[in-house]
């Protein structure tokens, strides 16, 4: 199992729209593609409170490539993204990392 850590930095004043898009659309679209989120977090204390951090679980890099590519091509995703950004972009930056658990990690 590998994990992908993704951090979305929302534009100022746009975090609620980003959270709504994930809650109302993104997660259910992921379900149809077999994408497995393990958790979602917002920053309470840190350098920015405009961040949504989440983690996805993958069996392999090949699975990640296949399922993420299918998600990005999904018309339902394009519609949800376009509607959520009707009055302007909501994301300033996205970063991601592919993580491999250590032998002593609770998540393997």
Task: For each feature predicted by the language model, list its residue ranges.
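Short amphipathic alpha-helical segments
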Residues: 14-40, 72
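Short, flexible helix/strand-to-coil boundary loops that buttress conserved ligand/catalytic motifs
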Residues: 22, 68, 81
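Glycine-rich beta-strand-turn "strand-cap" elements at beta-sheet edges
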Residues: 33-50, 78-108
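Glyoxalase I/VOC metalloenzyme domain signal
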Residues: 2, 48-50, 57-76, 101-108
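A short, polar/proline- and glycine-enriched secondary-structure boundary/capping micro-motif
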Residues: 17, 77-78
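Short, structured motif recognition centered on aromatic/hydrophobic residues
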Residues: 2-7, 18, 30, 52-58, ...
């Amino acid at each position: 199992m590998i994990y992908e850590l993704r951090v979305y930095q929302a534009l100022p004043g746009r975090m609620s729209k980003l959270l709504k898009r994930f809650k109302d659309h993104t997660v259910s679209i992921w379900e149809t593609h077999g994408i497995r989120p393990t958790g979602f977090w917002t920053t309470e204390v840190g350098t920015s409170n405009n961040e949504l951090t989440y983690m996805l679980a993958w069996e392999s890099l090949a699975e990640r490539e296949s399922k993420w590519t299918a998600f990005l091509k999904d018309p339902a995703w394009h519609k949800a993204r376009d509607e959520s950004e009707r009055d302007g972009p909501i994301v300033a930056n996205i970063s991601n990392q592919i993580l491999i658990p250590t032998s002593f990690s609770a998540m393997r």
